[in-house]
Amino acid sequence: MDSGLYPKTGAPTWFYGWSKQREGGFSDFGSEIFRLRALPPLKAEIFRGIREVVEYNITGDSHPGYPWCKLGSDNKAVLTGFGDLIWDEVAKRFNNMLGYGDAIFSMTPSELVQNGICDAVKVFIKQEPHSLEKVNAGRLRIIAAVGLVDQIVTRLLCMKQNNAEIDCWESCPSAPGMGLNDEGLRTLYSTAQVMAEHGTICETDISGWDWSVQQWELDSDARLRTQLAGEEIGGYLNFFLRVHAYVVGHSVFVMPDGEMLEQTVPGGQLSGDYNTSSSNSRMRVIATMFARYLAGQVSGFPLLGIKAMGDDSFEIWFKGLEEYLGKMGHTVKMCVQRPGLVGFEFCSQVFLGLGIAYPVDFSKTLYRFLSHHPADPKYSEYRAQLMYYFRHLPSSTLQKVIRLAGARVERAQKLATSSN
């Protein structure tokens, strides 16, 4: 895959300063030679310059994961009360990686946790509306809450690259930085128009993408991140990124009742991992590029012929797309070709033209709005956000939304009255 379409950033500043003070190379990891030549262990003080930035960008009200949930109910509480402890653990995590070296890649998920390479991952059902079909089938959306220390480790390694991709989303095959404002919608539609000059645009729906990610795809993402940072394959940064890819695909899961389950089949992307949006986007691009190669199809299209935001994508269709994605472990639930871009969909939006799109399904957005109490001080702000999100809905559909919302509110009021 041509990494030239992704922004090149250089290594993280803290890492560059630290690694240049060390001697030896990756081939010495875990050996007596390496230990004798290495400087003293990495300490939390080296992160002093970036600590504030990292903590500012961490979502404060998110779950801190296991075992840090024992210290506080959310990230903010844990960092406020135990910040120094957390950063000491971050430094210890890096030192544990260096201490075990290549032996990490033969560890079981349980051994990774026991040896302090990573923490177990807390899983729970996402608090959002699920369709009756999914409820009856037991296909509920599972969230994997990665522990706070692991979140910080990943941010230290990947924040610089992830932010660069967000800033460059218009010219990059990955689009984590895309917006659904009118300018963002125009850019996306223009991109689809350019691609449509080279073939028919299609959109695909991969069944359970996160759980279908293969270990080699996680490893490929780590390799590309190393190249984009301008670092050597086999160097320190590459080693840390390889470890991250390995622990993501070899997890211990903590159930809500405390039961722990060890992953036996490598692979899968953790929904709560800091890299999920960025890595899923890149791996979705990699999957199409590999499928195209296996199908013997030409490449060299604008943006590699695909635009991806997480597992959502639109791309130039080719014969064998569904077949070869399936052979790679990604079951294609739906592949719709859109000749002339008529009604093409991306990120749950139906595009009608340049800068015009509306939600495919408005029910979840409406549900979230109705969950706010009218007495909430920000209620008018929430309403304005809702109407902006629905700004391009056809008038008949918008009236349907308003009637539906009114009916739901009336029903809720009756239920509340009867219960009292």
Swiss-Prot record:
GO terms for biological process: DNA-templated transcription; viral RNA genome replication. This is RNA-directed RNA polymerase. The keyword Ribosomal protein does not apply. RNA-dependent RNA polymerase which replicates the viral genome. Keywords: Nucleotide-binding, Nucleotidyltransferase, RNA-directed RNA polymerase, Transferase, Viral RNA replication. It catalyses: RNA(n) + a ribonucleoside 5'-triphosphate = RNA(n+1) + diphosphate. Might be cleaved to release the mature protein(s). One of its GO terms (molecular function) is RNA binding. It comes from the Viruses. Belongs to the ssRNA positive-strand viruses RNA-directed RNA polymerase family. Residues 199-325 form the RdRp catalytic domain. Pfam families: RdRP_4 (PF02123). InterPro entries: DNA/RNA_pol_sf (IPR043502), RNA-dir_pol_luteovirus (IPR001795), RNA-dir_pol_PSvirus (IPR007094). Its EC number is 2.7.7.48. The keyword Transcription does not apply.
